[in-house]
Amino acid sequence: MKKVSDIHAIKIIFFITATYVGLWAIRIPTIKDQLQTDYVGVGYIMLSFAIGSIVAMIFANALILKTSTKSILTCTLIAEGCLWLPVPFIHELWLFMVFSFVFGMSYGAFEIACNVYASNLEVREKKSMMSGFHAFWSLGVLFGSLITSFLLEWNYSFIFNILLYVIILLPLSLYFVLCLESQVETKSEDSSKKNIFFIWPLLIFLLALIAMANALTEGSVDAWGALYMRDFIQV
């Protein structure tokens, strides 16, 4: 069988992980009811996830330099699939927060590795492709949300929903990650200079503010949209 090109493979990997995000976005009310918590408790879960993601992002570059983007993607894709399996059986908020932190670390490392691989493809192919990669991410969120919505409408259980996604998506993600080339990152000649964290120019701060604003709007929809629709609009 002809091997899938790494360009198409990384697009599908974006799509697969985003499908899990779609599952999460629609099932947040289910998780809230399962934990018997309030909106503050849901906020703690989101905060734990965000902190875990940030921690992983800080160390992701060093891990990629020691291994490769393909290795990090393989580990995080396996983790993302397996970490979903215990979710329906957790009923304590504090335990779910710890779990959310670990989940966030996996997700953060995945995002860095996946975008690094995509950026290297742009350099290799000498053309802009990032918008196309992220288009598959958006399609994945839409697809995951749509299928989960159908399963909810048809009264399928949360456990069935998760098993269906993991059984299908985990093997697919492993197949497509095997189609990737092994990219080994190397430190640049300027790596010995002072850490850029302390010498960020104004432009970097502006870009960071724009990214934060975008994350706030994205999070308000992804994380709270389903709760708002159920509890206030009563859909």
Model-derived regions, located:
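Extracytoplasmic gate region of multi-pass secondary transporters
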Residues: 24-25, 200-235
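Helix-breaking motifs and short loop linkers at transmembrane-helix boundaries and internal kinks
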Residues: 36, 68, 89-94
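Helix-to-loop junctions at the C-terminal end of transmembrane segments
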Residues: 56-68, 152
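Primarily marks hydrophobic transmembrane alpha-helices of the MFS/SLC 12-helix fold
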Residues: 70-73
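C-terminal ends and interior cores of transmembrane alpha-helices
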Residues: 78-91
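Paired small-residue
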Residues: 83, 94-103
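Cytoplasmic helix-loop-helix junction between adjacent transmembrane helices
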Residues: 100-135
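Symmetry-related core transmembrane helices of the 12-TM Major Facilitator Superfamily/SLC fold
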Residues: 159-178
